[in-house]
Regions:
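A short, exposed loop/beta-hairpin motif centered on an aromatic-Gly-Thr core
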Residues: 15-25
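Short amphipathic, charge-patterned alpha-helical segments
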Residues: 30-34
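A structural detector for beta-sheet-dominated domains
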Residues: 6, 23-25, 51
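Short linear/disordered segments characteristic of secreted peptide precursors
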Residues: 10, 27-29, 52
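Short aromatic-glycine-(Arg/Gly/Cys) micro-motifs in beta-strand/loop hairpins
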Residues: 1-17
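Short, mixed-charge low-complexity intrinsically disordered segments
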Residues: 36-53
Length: 53
């Protein structure tokens, strides 16, 4: 399913809040994909939601 992940791209949760849509089986996997893509810690993940398009 398509999942929307909102995240802060810089250390200490700074910078503009960003949003990306990824294809994953669950919310945890979607957050992990974004953390790996942008090399950010879990605390930088702001929200994970179902993408409603």
């Amino acid at each position: 399913m398509k999942i929307e992940v909102q995240y802060f791209p810089l250390e200490n949760c700074s910078g503009n809040l960003c949003k990306i849509v990824v294809e994953a089986t669950d919310y945890g996997s979607a957050a992990q994909i974004v953390m790996n893509m942008f090399n950010i810690p879990q605390r930088n993940i702001y929200a994970v939601n179902t993408y409603l398009g």
